[in-house]
């Protein structure tokens, strides 16, 4: 059993014998049920550094969204010397470390695909290195090349026609969360020792190919851990041993995360669940008289400042899918322990308080793990932050904890994963709205007129028959589920082979559980379309080739989002049916299939590729985001809409059910206190029904319109809104995406 001097004052034994951060937390954290009166404002150092960073962000926006771009150096753990927000003020930074050598400079990351790395440069006027082009086209294969080498013609056709779309075949998959707390608690040498033991454990007689691969992966992980020490040494720190105090704990932990974002540009690069862990160090330092509350808040502010600075070089097609430059540096606060104790500490308040000390921001993607049993003071403080900043999302700890335990992280937008025990294979989305049109048209794409799906007999009747449509749709979903999973299997095989996340996996157990994430787009449109076919009369309008291109729906029909079981039962049926089909497919590395109802801002792109639907949505119009009801469908107010979404069973969509709601301030109350109390009551009722997720926006449509028309106004520089699964600065969205946000329902009544 190890017993480092840095652990003096900490309780427990089990976490010293084996890597078990959860046990360390359980034995040492201090729950807090008081109010927010202890919080401190920003220090002079915070104001100076944040002021400088805001100047750089303004310059970045003026240059078209990119301040600087690397073209000559391949990003890696030891690719750069030290970098600071401002060299002349580096002594002010209590947490140091940049992705490159300059703030907001975007790294060159070719392992996912050289073409994408180069296009990201040329899009913004930078000329990529000819030498690196030669290396990564002649001598070093990339993930992207590997995937396209083995794609079948059917996969290429489905991808091109966007019935499966947003696939991580041209960008890093992300969604793997290293347990960055391990660097602080154990030091890197101890982690290397444990990985070396695992490496030797797999040296046995009669080894198979899977053993060979695992040994190679562990060797890569050990190499990454050694390079982590070199990276930290550049900044003057020795992370070989555990952190001795809160300052070192924050710095060590951040170095672990920095290693991840120096080596991977995944669509989601989550931070994980760190607040309670760091609070333990802070409480010990308070007792020792070596830390003040002002210093503790400064430490959190500076750490969050670093998360706000994370940048990746992206191509235009990526930005269309994930608009506003998100990185999903998702960071969780609150939740309950399996022993019933609240996990809320003073540090959970401090992380939310950064939105007051430094203003609203999309990153980190602050996520409250919500339960009606959380301390009332904390619930009210979190709700107040939502009312004033619209920067926080909420996820139901009561439905996630029984599945993932009480030490899980959110690995992207809304998806849970056990910290340090699991990884998730990210799978983008299947367009179930387009699949419905394929069922009607016998596999012919309604836009391109190409035979994409199986050439089943199309529906030829003038009016759609519900039973016939359901039978054809069931068959077409069979085809889509199999093709979708096969495509993802290829992607993840090649990502492991050519763009392996060694630095992150080094901070995760070797014997890891894997989940296989999929996703659904067009959910509410399918539900409403099926409802229209069942309860109204839907006449098919066909073109000269006999392809259904529009629909004339006559009569009324129940719509999802109004707490009407006739529509809501169809929503449950759809989710259950598609998940059942996915679960029958073979998944890579024995991963466990899950699905999500989540679209990000890609609902606009998906909508462009999708024809008119029986629910009344027309060709090219955006799809409704996530599990949200269709635009204009909600007629009975906010609570009815929430009730409909809450009926979707989380166990059928363990990858998450995203629900984004915008509420007019006047609908919530006359002042912030009344709005805060009412929002807490709404969330208590919503989550107690078993609902999974809620994005909360509190503003009116008129503010969005003014921000769109006058982005130069100072008050809109950091105007942050919640969209499906993340937050974004509104003025960073494209005009088209801004119009989509404005078109969404803003509830004027409860």
Give each language-model segment a name.
Residues 2-750:
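Conserved catalytic cores of very large enzyme subunits
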């Amino acid at each position: 059993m190890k017993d480092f001097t840095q652990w003096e004052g900490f309780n427990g034994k089990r976490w010293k014998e084996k890597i078990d951060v959860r046990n360390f937390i359980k034995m040492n954290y201090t729950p807090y049920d008081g109010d927010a009166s202890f919080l401190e404002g920003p220090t002079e150092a915070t104001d100076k550094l944040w002021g400088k960073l805001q100047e750089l962000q303004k310059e970045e926006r003026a240059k078209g969204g990119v301040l600087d771009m690397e073209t000559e150096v391949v990003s890696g753990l030891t690719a750069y010397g030290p970098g600071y927000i401002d060299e002349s003020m580096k002594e002010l930074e209590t947490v140091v470390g940049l992705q490159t050598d300059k703030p907001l400079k975007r790294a060159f990351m070719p392992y996912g695909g050289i073409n994408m790395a180069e296009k990201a440069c040329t899009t913004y006027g930078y000329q990529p290195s000819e030498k690196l082009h030669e290396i990564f086209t002649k001598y070093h294969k990339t993930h992207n090349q590997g995937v396209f080498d083995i794609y079948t013609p059917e996969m290429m056709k489905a991808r091109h026609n966007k019935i499966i779309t947003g696939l991580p075949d041209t960008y890093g998959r992300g969604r793997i969360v290293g347990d960055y707390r391990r660097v602080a608690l154990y030091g890197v040498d101890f982690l290397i020792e444990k990985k070396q033991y695992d490496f030797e454990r797999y040296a046995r007689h009669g080894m198979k190919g899977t053993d060979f691969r695992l040994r190679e992966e562990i060797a890569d992980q050990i190499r990454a851990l050694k390079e982590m020490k070199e990276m930290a040494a550049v900044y003057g720190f020795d992370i070989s041993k555990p952190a001795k105090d809160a300052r070192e704990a924050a710095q060590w932990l951040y170095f672990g995360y920095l290693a991840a974002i120096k080596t991977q540009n995944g669509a989601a690069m989550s931070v994980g669940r760190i607040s309670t862990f760091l609070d333990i160090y802070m409480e010990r330092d308070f007792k020792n008289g070596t830390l003040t509350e002002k210093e503790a808040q400064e430490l959190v502010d500076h750490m969050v400042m670093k998360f706000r600075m994370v940048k990746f070089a992206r191509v235009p097609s990526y930005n269309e899918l994930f608009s506003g430059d998100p990185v999903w540096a998702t960071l969780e606060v609150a939740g309950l322990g399996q022993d019933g104790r609240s996990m809320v500490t003073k540090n959970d308040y401090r992380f939310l308080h950064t939105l007051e000390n430094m203003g609203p921001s999309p990153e980190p993607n602050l996520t409250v793990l919500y339960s009606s049993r959380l301390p009332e003071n904390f619930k009210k403080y979190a709700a107040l932050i939502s009312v004033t900043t619209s920067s926080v999302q909420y996820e139901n700890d009561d439905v996630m904890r029984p599945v993932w335990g009480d030490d899980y992280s959110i690995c992207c937008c809304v998806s849970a994963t056990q910290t340090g025990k699991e990884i998730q294979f990210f799978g983008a989305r299947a367009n179930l709205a387009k699949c419905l049109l394929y069922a009607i048209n016998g596999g012919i794409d309604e836009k391109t007129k190409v035979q994409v799906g199986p050439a089943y007999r199309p529906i030829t009747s003038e009016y759609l028959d519900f039973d016939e449509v359901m039978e054809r749709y069931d068959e077409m979903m069979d085809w889509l589920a199999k093709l979708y999973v096969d495509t993802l299997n290829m992607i993840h095989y090649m990502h492991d082979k050519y763009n392996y996340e060694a630095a992150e996996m080094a901070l995760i157990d070797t014997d890891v559980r894997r989940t296989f994430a999929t996703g659904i787009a067009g959910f509410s449109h399918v539900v409403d379309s099926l409802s229209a076919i069942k309860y109204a009369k839907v006449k098919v309008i066909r073109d000269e080739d006999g392809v259904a291109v529009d629909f004339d729906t006559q009569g009324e029909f129940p719509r999802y989002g109004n707490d009407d079981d006739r529509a809501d039962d169809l929503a449950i049926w759809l989710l259950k049916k598609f998940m059942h089909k996915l679960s029958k497919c073979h998944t890579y590395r024995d991963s466990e299939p899950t699905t999500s109802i989540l679209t990000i801002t890609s609902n606009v792109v998906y909508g462009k590729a999708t024809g008119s639907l029986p629910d009344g949505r027309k060709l090219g119009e955006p799809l409704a985001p996530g599990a949200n009801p269709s635009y204009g469908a909600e007629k009975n107010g906010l609570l009815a809409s929430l009730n409909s979404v809450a009926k979707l069973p989380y166990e059928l969509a363990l990858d998450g059910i995203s629900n984004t709601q915008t509420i007019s301030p006047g609908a919530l109350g006359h002042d912030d206190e009344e709005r805060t109390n009412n929002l807490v009551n709404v969330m208590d009722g919503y989550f107690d029904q078993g609902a999974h997720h809620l994005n909360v926006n509190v503003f009116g449509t008129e503010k969005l319109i003014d921000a769109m028309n006058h982005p130069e106004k100072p008050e809109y520089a950091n105007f942050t809104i919640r969209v499906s699964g993340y937050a974004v600065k509104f003025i960073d969205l494209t005009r088209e995406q801004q119009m989509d946000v404005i078109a969404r329902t803003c509830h004027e009544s409860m």
